[in-house]
């Protein structure tokens, strides 16, 4: 079964990599082999997927498309506990006291760097992912992104499932990367990324601070995010059509359907 699945996966990946506007920039053969091991049940535990990339690369959109497509398939075929999402942003340290002291989040952010991995408790995130992979239910933290910098701990139950997926700026950094079976990096051109950032900044009413925020994020990305691409099994194009991502995921799910349903 493993040999058959690996052969089919190689063909599916080959066809996509050689298509116009492919979703892939790079795929390691070891990633395809590992996927075949999971799909053939040679590895019987849950698998974990980490998706990283700089701000406005498209990683959150890609992660949600993966989650929604798999959940739709799971509902159709009555598969329980198909996929669980771990939100990396929920692991930002609680800095609500510092926000209050500064008078506003904007003032706080001028003196506190949120664009470095040290701003997040990534060791706790790794612990939670490992616990889920061992079949345990975990209570996750929840970080308030509205500007209070409040993090409430042990509030969101996460249940063990077949796939644990997480995306974030620092998902492939040293303190957490070993938690993932599949390491994915989303690559995007500078011009597209900048355009997306400023569109989002306008929606969030960043005003005059947008330039400063963008410059800081870009500079820190060169140090903390871009180098993590070297750890990736798969590099995706953050500029590919969303429909192309869904189509590819459905091809993998069609193989699952052929084998097990």
Model-found features: residue ranges?
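NTP-dependent small-molecule kinase module
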Residues: 5-43, 159, 178, 195-202, ...
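The conserved Walker
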Residues: 55
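Conserved lysine of the Walker
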Residues: 59
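Hydrophobic positions on the alpha1 helix immediately C-terminal to the Walker A/P-loop
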Residues: 62
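Short beta-strand-centered segment that lines the nucleotide-binding/catalytic pocket of NTP-utilizing
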Residues: 75-96
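Conserved nucleotide-sensing/catalytic segment adjacent to the nucleotide-binding pocket
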Residues: 93-143
